[in-house]
Amino acid sequence: MKKLLALIASFAIMLVTASAFVDKRQEASLGEESPMLVVNSGDSLVSLDSFQGCWVILSFWSAADARSRMTQNDVAVFMRSHKLPAQAGKVEVVSVNLDRSERLMEEIVKIDNLDENSQFRIDNASMAEYAIQAYRMNEGLRTFVINPEGKLVAADPSVDDLKRIIS
């Protein structure tokens, strides 16, 4: 009986110790590397790591979150209307839709005149939950700026913030 209790206690201590070591890339923090993210792009998958070396405006949205949808439009207007200086480097927009319906997303992209090439999806519920937790979006969907080194440099930037950060 003592051995069983010792074994259970050892297992409990091991569990507590193991959970104390969290991969820093699993939670978004400004100044740290962006959490890993893989999204659907048509018939293929795209990793956020594939944009290393570029500025990335990472924006999460859904039809049900009006603020996130308005942010999509702000980012689209920013990208169309602001000539970025050559020294800013390449800027990519990764707009991640969390709606279950791909058709709904496609309709909104057309209605809002968004760039189809920058639209991606997470259609798996567990991956969507991971993204919500990793990017700390418990109170609504958000937008982030990632520098060419892959570090988060801004959260929920305004158009003026985007101009200042990227140029």
What spans do the regions from the language model cover?
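N-terminal targeting signals for export/organelle localization
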Residues: 1-35, 167
